[in-house]
Regions:
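Local sequence-structure signature of Cys/Sec-based thiol-disulfide redox active-site neighborhoods
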Residues: 1-31
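Thiol-based oxidoreductase modules, predominantly thioredoxin-like and allied folds used
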Residues: 7-9, 31-47
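Short alpha-helical
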Residues: 13, 46, 76
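Generic recognition of short, well-ordered alpha-helical segments
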Residues: 17-20, 49, 73
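Cysteine-centric redox/oxidoreductase cores and disulfide-bonded domains
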Residues: 21-23, 27-28, 56, 75, ...
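Structural micro-motif
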Residues: 52-64
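Non-catalytic, surface beta->alpha helical segment in thiol-disulfide oxidoreductase systems
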Residues: 63-89
Length: 89
């Protein structure tokens, strides 16, 4: 199972939209159960430290094995990103 890390700002509408689209994609049979989603709030010390360790300074961002998806993307782009991650095995 791949670890997909979500860095977000909980009070931000952009982060909420990004997270909603990501969860919608992860619910598809193609991706269901294939990712372990870890959430880091960038308002916390732990979240900021984790983000810095992988070179991320903005939110919302999804990160997995060196691949980064930044900002609000279409459902298609999110699915394309997840397929790319699964193809890396």
């Amino acid at each position: 199972m791949k670890k997909l890390i979500l860095f977000y700002l909980p009070d931000c509408n952009v982060s909420k939209l990004f997270e909603e689209r990501l969860y919608k994609a992860l619910a598809l049979p193609e991706f269901a159960g294939r990712f372990n989603l870890i959430r880091h709030n960038l308002y916390t010390d732990t979240g900021r430290q984790e983000a810095r360790s992988v070179g991320i300074s903005d939110a919302p961002t999804a990160y997995c094995n060196g691949d980064i998806l930044r900002g609000v993307q279409s459902d298609y782009i999110i699915r394309k990103y997840l397929r790319k991650l699964l193809g890396q095995s």
